[in-house]
């Protein structure tokens, strides 16, 4: 039962792909120093990344108003690249740490410049320049992105979490909760709620989404010598299963998937009635995201004997969209909007 060793994590873009594509995207900005056009270029860069790396999130974000959609795409680029550095780049641990440190220094340095064009002319990447512009416009505190990069650094050296609270407070906060916070600023709060209430809702949803991703990726993570299931969790025989996952034991991997998905289910339920905290024009996309990933999580729970990576079909994804939005979504996908 050790054939999982042969399974390879899917590599979407190599490090060179990232560098080449970034060079071309950056060149477009430098050719035309117009603020509005530069935001569009930064957003298009983010859209290319989002479409390539997450078809599910790409689909639900088509339901956002144009301005918010553009800003979400920029945010996605800023969180996807560091994640790929850690998980996909063929580099030593120290080389990955150095890239993340340089990325953090770029982010801090970017505060010194007025706009995207000026940042690019001072050796700031388009990924960071676009994200800094979003942070400036929405007044997103720098500490959240620093926390995100710190969480990415933790993934370079596998960490052990003693219980759910330890995992949520000391890893998921940086890797997912703060991303939910970024989106809260962009989505905005309704007249009857506050930014703080939106952030609490985003926190619960971010935890749920991250736990679902952990559940789906247990097999791939075990190849990397990584296990996010807390050390205190036990299987139906009351046996600790953490070491079994690290050692690629199929039964323990399946048990881990189910425990993670069950914990995720609790967090989906916690935020399901609080999506109205957000502005009306953002709710459809947020509800679609909640429904889509809940469906994926339930699929993991139902396929109790499957240790492979679950996914939703195109039909399953489209089925979560209200029928009166089919045309809008179809046009957006066909026209690559």
Regions found by a protein language model. Give the residues of each.
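Catalytic cores of Mg2+-dependent Asp-rich isoprenoid enzymes
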Residues: 1-209, 215, 220-337
């Amino acid at each position: 039962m050790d054939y999982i060793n042969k399974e390879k994590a899917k590599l979407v873009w190599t490090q060179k792909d990232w560098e080449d594509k970034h060079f071309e995207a950056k060149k477009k900005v430098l050719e035309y120093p117009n603020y509005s056009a530069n935001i569009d270029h930064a957003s298009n860069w983010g859209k290319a990344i989002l479409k390539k790396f997450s078809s599910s999130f790409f689909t639900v974000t088509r339901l956002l108003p144009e301005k918010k959609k553009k800003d979400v795409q920029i945010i996605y680029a800023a969180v996807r690249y560091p994640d790929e550095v850690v998980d996909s780049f063929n580099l030593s641990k120290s080389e990955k740490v150095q890239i993340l440190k340089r990325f953090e220094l770029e982010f801090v340095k970017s505060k010194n410049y007025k706009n995207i064009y000026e940042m690019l002319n001072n050796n700031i990447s388009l990924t960071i320049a676009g994200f800094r512009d979003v942070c400036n416009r929405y007044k997103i505190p720098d500490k959240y992105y620093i926390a995100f990069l710190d969480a990415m650094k933790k993934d370079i050296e596998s960490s052990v979490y003693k219980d759910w609270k330890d995992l949520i407070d000391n890893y998921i906060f940086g890797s997912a909760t703060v991303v939910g916070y970024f989106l809260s600023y962009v989505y905005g709060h309704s007249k009857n709620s506050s930014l703080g209430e939106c952030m609490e809702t985003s926190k619960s949803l971010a935890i749920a989404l991250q736990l679902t991703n952990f559940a789906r990726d247990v097999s791939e993570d075990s190849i990397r010598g990584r296990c996010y299931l807390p050390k205190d969790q036990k299987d139906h025989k009351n046996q600790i299963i953490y070491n079994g996952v690290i050692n690629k034991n199929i039964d323990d991997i399946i048990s881990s998937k189910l425990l993670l998905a069950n914990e995720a289910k609790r967090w989906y339920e916690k935020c399901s009635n609080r999506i109205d905290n957000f502005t009306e024009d953002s709710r459809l996309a947020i509800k679609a995201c909640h429904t889509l990933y809940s469906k994926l999580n339930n699929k993991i729970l139902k396929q109790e004997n499957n240790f492979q990576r679950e996914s939703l079909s195109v039909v399953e994804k489209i089925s979560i969209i209200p029928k009166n939005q089919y045309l809008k979504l179809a046009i957006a996908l066909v026209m690559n909007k």
